[in-house]
Curated annotation (Swiss-Prot):
Pathway, per record: Cofactor biosynthesis; 7,8-dihydroneopterin triphosphate biosynthesis; 7,8-dihydroneopterin triphosphate from GTP: step 1/1
Protein name, UniProt field: GTP cyclohydrolase FolE2
Keyword S-adenosyl-L-methionine in record: no
Native organism: Thermosipho africanus (strain TCF52B)
Function recorded in the entry: Converts GTP to 7,8-dihydroneopterin triphosphate.
Organism taxonomic ancestry: Bacteria, Thermotogati, Thermotogota, Thermotogae, Thermotogales
Length: 259
């Protein structure tokens, strides 16, 4: 049977990334409290393609992924990339995995437990020289505007925001620890279930702890800078403004911080 993908391409244009994108796939990830958590990931997998090959073999990406029996952790991700390079005869391989991650969270006053959803994941890029591994968390939080509080007699505008943390590391860093860092840097964390005493606490806590997105980004960055496991990091904070028809945004990475 004719193998069109392997035929020679005369245009002599190498491609940096070819592969599959937005694959929905069941996975098992490490959970700090419960050891494992089942979830559904969205996965991108790529390899490079030499200038003289017409196309890659898309089915082989799934064949490689299926070998690992749904288990996704830092050790397996390195093995997946090695297998991709070997199977597809590539010089480089990369994978991006994002998934909903759930933690049981107690309301601040009543202590009623409910599940809180976060978006977490891994990114890894493997070339012949080295393998770069990243952990990603996206944490919903709340911010209350310091300026609004200062100039207003009765209240201050507040809103949900999203803190996104990406760290490069060669060691295990728990999602839970990065999530806790983001929440502790906000005006107040978010909760799925709140009774009236909890709602009173959250409202007053935010008012007592006003923060700009710039404040949140800087506080997270300073804490990440102290973590010796982290080689590089990037922090993004986006606030979904309640009184504006636009969002507020702040970003910092370790390259731009003073040593």
């Amino acid at each position: 049977m004719r193998d069109v993908q392997s035929e020679r391409d005369e245009r002599n244009v190498p491609l940096k990334h070819v592969g599959i994108k937005n694959l929905k796939y069941p996975v098992v990830v490490l959970d700090k409290k419960n050891k494992n958590q089942h979830t559904i990931a969205e996965i991108n997998m790529y390899v490079d393609l030499p200038k003289d090959f017409r196309g890659t073999h898309m089915s082989r990406f799934l064949e490689v992924l299926n070998k690992f029996h749904l288990k996704i952790d830092p050790k397996n991700i390195k093995a997946i990339l090695d297998d991709l390079k070997k199977t597809l005869k590539a010089q480089s391989a990369s994978i991006e995995i994002m998934f909903p991650y759930f933690l049981q969270k107690k309301a601040p006053v009543t202590k009623i437990e409910s599940y809180m959803e976060y978006k977490c994941g891994f990114k890894a890029y493997d070339t012949n020289e080295e393998c770069e591994f990243y952990i990603v968390v996206e944490v919903p939080i709340q911010t209350l505007c310091p300026c609004s509080k200062e100039i207003s007699k009765y209240n201050a505008h507040n809103q949900r925001a999203l803190a996104r943390i990406e760290v490069e590391t060669s060691e295990l860093i728990w999602f839970e620890d990065l999530i806790e860092l983001a929440e502790s840097s906000a005006s107040v964390p978010l909760f799925t279930l709140l009774k009236r005493p909890d709602e009173k606490y959250v409202t007053e806590k935010a008012y007592e702890n006003p923060k700009f997105v710039e404040d949140v980004a800087r506080d997270i960055a300073l804490s990440l800078k102290e973590n010796k496991k982290i080689r590089w990091f990037k922090v993004e904070v986006e606030s979904f403004e309640s009184i504006h028809n636009h969002n507020a945004y702040a970003c910092v990475n370790s390259d731009t911080m003073e040593v």
